[in-house]
Curated annotation (Swiss-Prot):
It holds the Pfam family TatA_B_E. It comes from Xanthomonas campestris pv. campestris (strain ATCC 33913 / DSM 3586 / NCPPB 528 / LMG 568 / P 25). Gene3D superfamilies: 1.20.5.3310. One of its GO terms (molecular function) is protein transmembrane transporter activity. InterPro entries: TatA/B/E (IPR003369), TatB (IPR018448). One of its GO terms (biological process) is protein transport by the Tat complex. This is Sec-independent protein translocase protein TatB.
Amino acid sequence: MFDIGFSELALIAVVALVVLGPERLPKAARFAGLWVRRARMQWDSVKQELERELEAEELKRSLQDVQASLREAEGQLRNTQQQVEDGARGLHDQARELHDEVGRDIDIRTSATPLAAPLELQADAPVVLEPGSAQPHTPVPAPAPVVAQAQPMAPAPKQTLVPAPHGSLTSTQVTTHAPTASATASSTSPQEKTP
């Protein structure tokens, strides 16, 4: 502590013996030892307190470093969360646009297709020609009442419009045309006619 060697201690002991004398020297030595012990204890306590303060300061610095890294990580997480939310919002907007586009396409297609079947007439509906028009007028049947349960219906026979020989349109049943006897007779060759 004081860097005092053996020769210096011997010199101090000789000076103390001469100054104090042999009677008071043991009492003075105890007193000096007590003060040296107290000084060492004070020095050790100050040293320990400085070390504790340095450790506390070091802990504070490390705590501040950890807090700074936590803030940085929190900022990165918020940025990542914001990016994910922006991406999700973008995907949601794209999905909504696709849904709207598909809905518009469906609306366009349904408005482009006719609602009634063209040129199909019901079996019991008479065809009426109005004077001065070439189009037949078919009365529109009243809508059928809504039934609580759906019942299967037999399909109605299909009718097509066939021009009559005198130029007006009439309704006839669709049938397969079988060749008539006169048509087959005229189409056979003279060699086949001989029995």
